[in-house]
């Protein structure tokens, strides 16, 4: 048993979709979350920048004595997961493999869509992961760069969001039966995405799928938390504390969250 917290990282508020599922499935676990809102979105960034920014977040979480790191960000997972895993002696999990595996199980037509940031689509990680498991599946990938900005600006229920989602997803409509939400921001737009794609299309939340793997790893390494009455989840953001709080408290349905501003640029765990 291990009562140290689980660390979650994301380029902004998107990883809160993973945090919500983690809190639901693993209520005894404490969370430390870092969202790099100041440098979001990561999608247009270079591979080198994304890796460097991911290390800033990883080192920040290590300074909080976490027992596991969850890359609750598809872009960071695509670019930096294997690099970080090689360097750390605690479990590190991403969100791409769980999402891909679930989509393979759910599709009936062997036609899967993937929507993600530009960097994730460029990396082709979802396509490669699915191809390794099943060569029979056709994967249609689509970058939706405007989605992250809509979520980060808390415009999910606006008319602009409805128009952007509808226009962005038009190339996939009628061509797939399963759609991977390949960015953890995207579940915050789920109602609009489902409406656009049609109710018959199965939406795969890659972050939610990852929580099942987190549970397996906690058991495997015997680092589950003891049942306890009091502990505090801590959320950190590199910019926009008030906006982050508004989105987090609404999405997690928890009031008075502990949310702080954090400086993580070139963060060194020895600080």
UniProtKB/Swiss-Prot annotation:
Cell wall biogenesis/degradation recorded as keyword: yes
Bilayer-crossing regions: none
Pfam families: Asp_Glu_race (PF01177)
UniProtKB keywords: Cell shape, Cell wall biogenesis/degradation, Isomerase, Peptidoglycan synthesis
Disulfide bond annotation, renumbered to this chain: none
PROSITE patterns, per database record: ASP_GLU_RACEMASE_1, ASP_GLU_RACEMASE_2
Annotated substrate binding sites: 10-11, 42-43, 74-75, 184-185
Cell wall biogenesis/degradation is among the record's keywords: yes
GO BP of this protein: cell wall organization; peptidoglycan biosynthetic process; regulation of cell shape
Domain of life: Bacteria
Residue positions of the active site: 73, 183
Broadest EC class assigned to this enzyme: isomerase
Enzymatic reactions: L-glutamate = D-glutamate
Similarity annotation: Belongs to the aspartate/glutamate racemases family.
Protein name (Swiss-Prot/TrEMBL): Glutamate racemase
